[in-house]
């Protein structure tokens, strides 16, 4: 607390110093027309634009003067005020500048803050890049005004040029978008028209009671991750009043949360930090922020794509109980869907790409919400941003935040549902290509700004600043969730993974898969929520580990279990997280009995879910061998079943070797008996002993001749003695020769 008050005291002392400094980045003059940027991009109101041009002894240019400047080579990728319009001069078509259009592109929305163009009648008729050294018509004031020329030269003077008190002391300041040529509600499509950010009611057929809420909330920050061939870019947003003074005195926790790291799977990634810490491209943005505007013929070098979500967060807990009927007018119509149509333009210095899509203005969860509707579940439709492809890039930005009014365990009253379901479409007069820019929204719970649904036009930036939780999204995937034609048959899920999610989503392995179904009269089932502890974090910040990205950090993972009373079907959507890669999957299990169990194994954990009407929370850990759950509705506590031990492979191999040895021993024993019946001699004669040993002296010649000896000898040759026969056995066989005399 002492640290907080110390920072607060220093901040209060230094805020006047930081606010008393204005940097004006100007470009070369083309037929007297030049571009002026104040501090960050898009931080000049229409009244201030006129005062600023007057301070430069200039005026707001007319359309004819802009066209003349365009004819001699003046083009930018910045929306700026001229007389009666907000325009971008474009010579070369670029998919992310002016929606791939050329000429003086007119933006129909001109009620917010942009840059400005000025016309100096005394300037040369051609290109003039001489340095501007002062504001000739500025009057005395306490503001330090720094003029930054295109070549980087700086000239400082004290004074003031603003005459409107609202410009000097804005009562409703808005953030400037220093990362993009346009913001979501100012984006445009081909043909010179735009879709404003406004609330649209899309009731389900047979529903004729559209509803809308006047409650406002803050817009969460959005990060667009773009890939053209092999590069990855992350768009960021900053505030005008934040400079290095503010950065020095930010709490360390807030600094840690100001990082967004992205990586596209399968590509060589360039990592851009979403905070103010310098790295390859963010530092370049800071330099441009201080040195020059980035207008001119090489404007494409200054821009990285960024979008701002118009999806509000969840209601305040106390206000939600009062205003629930605004979100859900009747318990019998939970199918009413509220969508916000948003057009989005990402500007890089060569052009503008228009996006259009449907964003859900439903409550955006800061991982855990503290409000809930006790009886009804309100499904909301999938939010999409429709990308306008170009000759080199096709960009898709999606964001979806879903929440369901169900009881939250341990007293929390809302379960968030959030996913990034992406459907791509085409904007007018645009062509498809094969190099997509894939967008991913990074919700920041404390970085949001309010959007009034009754106001069709939102400010380009919200009032919040980016000091909330950090959710890093690496790689990308798109999920198409389609409701079935029959409201009682559930959902059709099409999961299309384009790469592994090395999700440093905080890398929170945190991504929920939400459902949108029709025909539910009153769904009393509560969502099933899992909290996963990931012990395997891989940062993708080019070898640097994010300071707030510690191993074992805990994130939230939601799964939703819904029941269909008419068909007695239970469909469970459960995110499955891999401990090694952080990849996600959704398992849809349909069972005939509403009380059946759905088993899920999470990286070694085996959790059993009992969709029996209560809120079942399962806490899993990748390092633990078991998991446990608790059911809010009763005293039952379920634990995962113990996995049956398996026979190890080494034991199987050992048993096989023993069997083989036994067979070999039997074979050897059998072969050792081969000598039986092979070493016998049969001798047939009339005397004793062998014929060779007898002397024929006792026989006369005729008798010896008449006697016939039969000497049968069955023996092996001496060259191949039996190796199994010993010497004793050989002698015994010789003495046991059978002699038969005839």
From Swiss-Prot:
**Listed name of the protein:** CD44 antigen
The residue ranges flagged as biased composition, category Low complexity, are 179-189, 386-396, 422-435, 502-516
Q: Which SUPFAM superfamilies does this entry report, sorted A to Z?
A: C-type lectin-like
PROSITE patterns xrefs: LINK_1, LINK_2
GO terms (molecular function) for this protein are:
collagen binding; hyaluronic acid binding; transmembrane signaling receptor activity
**What organism does the UniProt record list as the source?**
Homo sapiens (Human)
Q: What is the lineage of its organism?
A: Eukaryota, Metazoa, Chordata, Craniata, Vertebrata
According to the record, glycans are attached at 25, 57, 100, 110, 120, 180, 350, 548, 599, 636
Q: Where in the cell is it found?
A: Cell membrane; Cell projection, Microvillus; Secreted
At which positions is hyaluronan bound?
Answer: 41, 78-79, 105
Which residues are exposed on the Extracellular face of the membrane?
A: 21-649
Q: Where are the transmembrane segments?
A: 650-670
GO CC annotations, alphabetized: apical plasma membrane; basolateral plasma membrane; cell projection; cell surface; cytosol; extracellular exosome; focal adhesion; Golgi apparatus
- Domain writeup: The lectin-like LINK domain is responsible for hyaluronan binding.
Q: Which residues carry this modification: Phosphoserine?
A: 672, 686, 697, 706
In this chain, the stretch annotated as Required for interaction with EZR, MSN and RDX and for co-localization to microvilli covers 673-691
**Role:** Cell-surface receptor that plays a role in cell-cell interactions, cell adhesion and migration, helping them to sense and respond to changes in the tissue microenvironment. Participates thereby in a wide variety of cellular functions including the activation, recirculation and homing of T-lymphocytes, hematopoiesis, inflammation and response to bacterial infection.
Sequence ranges of Polar residues compositional bias: 261-273, 439-452, 476-489, 528-539, 592-606
């Amino acid at each position: 607390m002492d640290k907080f008050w110390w920072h607060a005291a220093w901040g209060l002392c230094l805020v006047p110093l930081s606010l008393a400094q204005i940097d004006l980045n100007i470009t070369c003059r083309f037929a007297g027309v030049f571009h002026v940027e104040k501090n960050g991009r898009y931080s000049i109101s229409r009244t201030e634009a006129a005062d600023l041009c007057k301070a430069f002894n200039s005026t707001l240019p007319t359309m004819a003067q802009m066209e003349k400047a365009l004819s001699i080579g003046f083009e930018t990728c910045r929306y700026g005020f001229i007389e009666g319009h907000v325009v971008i001069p474009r010579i070369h078509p670029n998919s992310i500048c002016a929606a791939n259009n050329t000429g003086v592109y007119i933006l129909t929305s001109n009620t917010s803050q942009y840059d400005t163009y000025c016309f100096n009648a005394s300037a040369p008729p051609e290109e003039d890049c001489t340095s501007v050294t002062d504001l000739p018509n500025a009057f005395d004031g306490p503001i330090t005004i720094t003029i930054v020329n295109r070549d980087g030269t700086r000239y400082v003077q004290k004074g003031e040029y603003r005459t409107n008190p609202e410009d000097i002391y804005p009562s409703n300041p808005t953030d400037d978008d220093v990362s993009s040529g346009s913001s979501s509600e100012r984006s445009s499509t081909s043909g010179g028209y735009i879709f404003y950010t406004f609330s649209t009611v899309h009731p389900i057929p047979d529903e004729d009671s559209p509803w809308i809420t006047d409650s406002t909330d803050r817009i969460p920050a959005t990060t667009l991750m773009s890939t053209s061939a092999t590069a990855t870019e992350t768009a960021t947003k900053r505030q005008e009043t934040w400079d290095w003074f503010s950065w020095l005195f930010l709490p360390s926790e807030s600094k840690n949360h100001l990082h967004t790291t992205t990586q596209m799977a399968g590509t060589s990634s360039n990592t851009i930090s979403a905070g103010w810490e310098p790295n390859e491209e963010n530092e370049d943005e800071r330099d441009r922020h201080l040195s020059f505007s980035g207008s001119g013929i090489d404007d494409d070098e200054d821009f990285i794509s960024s979008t701002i979500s118009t999806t509000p967060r969840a209601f305040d807990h106390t206000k939600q109980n009062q205003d629930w009927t605004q979100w859900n007018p009747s318990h019998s119509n939970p199918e009413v869907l509220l969508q916000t149509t948003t057009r989005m333009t990402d500007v890089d210095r060569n052009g503008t790409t228009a996006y259009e899509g449907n964003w859900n203005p439903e409550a955006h969860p800061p991982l855990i919400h503290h409000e809930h509707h006790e009886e009804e579940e309100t499904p909301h439709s999938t939010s999409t941003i429709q990308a306008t492809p170009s000759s080199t890039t096709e960009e898709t930005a999606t964001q979806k935040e879903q929440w369901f009014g169900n009881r939250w365990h341990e007293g929390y009253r809302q379960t968030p549902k959030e996913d990034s379901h992406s459907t791509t479409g085409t904007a007018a007069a645009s062509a498809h290509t094969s190099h997509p820019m894939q967008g991913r929204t990074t919700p920041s719970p404390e970085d949001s700004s309010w959007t009034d649904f009754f106001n069709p036009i939102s400010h380009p930036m919200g009032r919040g600043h980016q000091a909330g939780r950090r959710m890093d999204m690496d790689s990308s995937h798109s999920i198409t969730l389609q409701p079935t034609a029959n409201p009682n048959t559930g959902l059709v899920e099409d999961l299309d993974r384009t790469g592994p999610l090395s999700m440093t989503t905080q890398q929170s392995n945190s991504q929920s898969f939400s459902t949108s179904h029709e025909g539910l009269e009153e769904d009393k089932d509560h969502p099933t929520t899992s909290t996963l502890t990931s012990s395997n974090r891989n940062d993708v910040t080019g070898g640097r580990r994010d300071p707030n990205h510690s191993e074992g950090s805990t994130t939230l993972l939601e799964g939703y279990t819904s029941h269909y009373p008419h068909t007695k079907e239970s469909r469970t959507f459960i995110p499955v997280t891999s401990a090694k890669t952080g990849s996600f999957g959704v398992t849809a299990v349909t069972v005939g009995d509403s009380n059946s169990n759905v088993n899920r194994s999470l990286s070694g954990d085996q959790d059993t879910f009992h969709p029996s009407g209560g809120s079942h929370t399962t806490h899993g850990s990748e390092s633990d061998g078991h998991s446990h759950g608790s059911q809010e509705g009763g005293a039952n506590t379920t634990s995962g079943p113990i996995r049956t031990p398996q026979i190890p492979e080494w034991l199987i191999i050992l048993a096989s070797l023993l069997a083989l040895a036994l067979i070999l021993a039997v074979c050897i024993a059998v072969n050792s008996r081969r000598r039986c019946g092979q070493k016998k001699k049969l001798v047939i004669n009339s005397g004793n002993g062998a014929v060779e040993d007898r002397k024929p002296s006792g026989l006369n010649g005729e008798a010896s001749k008449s006697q016939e000896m039969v000497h049968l000898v069955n023996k092996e040759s001496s060259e191949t003695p039996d190796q199994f026969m010993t010497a004793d056995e050989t002698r015994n066989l010789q003495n046991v020769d059978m002699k038969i005399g005839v």
